[in-house]
């Protein structure tokens, strides 16, 4: 935490230091509004949801990686 708010020249940084805000995790909006950057808040909704498993997909290794695929017992190559 910052405790040397008298040595800071900018009034915005004085305000940050006065409230003992850690400048490493805070940014200042140009209009003078304090925005706290929290990594937990920046996680998108898609990242919060668990990954869904594929329904009816191929079991085992990915066949497209090896250049062949099996359809109803018949192997096709593409």
From Swiss-Prot:
Stored InterPro entries: SDHF4
Recorded superkingdom: Bacteria
Family that this chain belongs to: Belongs to the SDHAF4 family.
Full protein name: UPF0369 protein RF_1112
The species this protein was found in: Rickettsia felis (strain ATCC VR-1525 / URRWXCal2)
Taxonomy of the source species: Bacteria, Pseudomonadati, Pseudomonadota, Alphaproteobacteria, Rickettsiales
């Amino acid at each position: 935490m910052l405790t040397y708010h008298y040595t800071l020249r900018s009034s915005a940084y004085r305000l940050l230091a006065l409230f003992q805000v850690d400048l490493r995790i805070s940014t200042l909006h140009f209009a003078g509004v304090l925005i706290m950057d929290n990594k937990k808040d920046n996680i998108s909704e898609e990242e919060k949801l668990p990954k869904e498993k594929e329904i009816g997909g191929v079991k085992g290794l990915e066949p497209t990686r090896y250049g062949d695929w099996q359809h109803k017992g018949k192997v096709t190559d593409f």
